[in-house]
Amino acid sequence: MSEELLKLLKAEGLDLLSCMHCGICTGSCPSGRHTGLNTRRIIRDARKNRAAVLSDYDLWLCTTCYTCQERCPRGIPITDAILELRRLAVREGLMLPEHRFVSEMVLECGHAVPLDEETKKKREELGLDPIPETVQKDPEALEGLKTLLKTCKFDELVAKK
């Protein structure tokens, strides 16, 4: 199974086999200092066990700052590999509940965090329009966004599998 994953990654120009497990990626990771993210382990797991790496919560802790990738002595595109692993995970229905919720909000109202009545009221108190110049204010733009998301099959990716 890991050979299949490595082939998929290599097809994207992401060859992980040259990793020498020096740990520079993990040691320089800002997110790893505060979370369980261990980029070296993710790379190792990608080489060994596809199922484990695609369902690993830590895969989603990367902030995509590219520090690991910039510092890798072998020039391994670590962040790019993590992003591709995430794409593969989503295609297999392995999306975190929080990401699924936010994605469903975007599909429904065009925003990850829709405006509630309290926020609209607070905006008015601050002298702002209750609804900012976004797709929430323009029904045609919202429908256009929904069409775009459907056309690129975002709704199918978000659907529970």
UniProtKB/Swiss-Prot annotation:
One matching Pfam family: Fer4_8
**Residues where [4Fe-4S] cluster 2 binds:** C29, C62, C65, C68
Q: Function of this protein?
A: Part of a complex that catalyzes the reversible reduction of CoM-S-S-CoB to the thiol-coenzymes H-S-CoM (coenzyme M) and H-S-CoB (coenzyme B). Catalyzes the transfer of electrons from ferredoxin to CoM-S-S-CoB during methanogenesis from acetate. Electrons transfer from ferredoxin to CoM-S-S-CoB via HdrA2, HdrC2 and HdrB2. In addition, the complex can use electron bifurcation to direct electron pairs from reduced coenzyme F420 towards the reduction of both ferredoxin and CoB-CoM heterodisulfide. This activity may take place during Fe(III)-dependent anaerobic methane oxidation.
Stated EC number for the protein is 1.8.7.3, 1.8.98.4
The keyword Repeat appears for this protein:
yes
The UniProt subunit note reads as follows: The ferredoxin/F(420)H(2)-dependent CoB-CoM heterodisulfide reductase is composed of three subunits; HdrA2, HdrB2 and HdrC2.
* Similarity comment: Belongs to the HdrC family.
Source organism phylogeny: Archaea, Methanobacteriati, Methanobacteriota, Stenosarchaea group, Methanomicrobia
User: Which UniProt keywords are given for this protein, alphabetically ordered?
Assistant: 4Fe-4S, Cytoplasm, Iron, Iron-sulfur, Metal-binding, Methanogenesis, Oxidoreductase, Repeat
Q: Spell out the subcellular localization from the entry.
A: Cytoplasm
Principal location: cytoplasm
Gene Ontology, cellular component aspect: cytoplasm
- Provide the reaction this enzyme catalyses: coenzyme B + coenzyme M + 2 oxidized [2Fe-2S]-[ferredoxin] = coenzyme M-coenzyme B heterodisulfide + 2 reduced [2Fe-2S]-[ferredoxin] + 2 H(+); coenzyme B + 2 oxidized coenzyme F420-(gamma-L-Glu)(n) + coenzyme M + 2 reduced [2Fe-2S]-[ferredoxin] + 4 H(+) = coenzyme M-coenzyme B heterodisulfide + 2 reduced coenzyme F420-(gamma-L-Glu)(n) + 2 oxidized [2Fe-2S]-[ferredoxin]
**GO MF, one annotated term:** 4 iron, 4 sulfur cluster binding
Domain 4Fe-4S ferredoxin-type intervals:
10-40, 51-82
The biological pathway it contributes to is: Cofactor metabolism; coenzyme M-coenzyme B heterodisulfide reduction; coenzyme B and coenzyme M from coenzyme M-coenzyme B heterodisulfide: step 1/1
Q: Which InterPro entries match?
A: 4Fe4S_Fe-S-bd, 4Fe4S_Fe_S_CS, CoB/CoM_hetero-S_Rdtase_csu, HdrC_iron-sulfur_subunit, Helical_ferredxn
Annotated GO biological processes are: methanogenesis
User: Which positions does UniProt annotate for [4Fe-4S] cluster 1 binding?
Assistant: C19, C22, C25, C72
- Which interval of the chain is the signal sequence? none
Annotated organism of origin: Methanosarcina acetivorans (strain ATCC 35395 / DSM 2834 / JCM 12185 / C2A)
Q: How many cofactors are bound and how?
A: Binds 2 [4Fe-4S] cluster.
Tell me which cofactor or cofactors this protein depends on.
Answer: [4Fe-4S] cluster
- Could you tell me what this protein is called? Ferredoxin/F(420)H(2)-dependent CoB-CoM heterodisulfide reductase subunit C
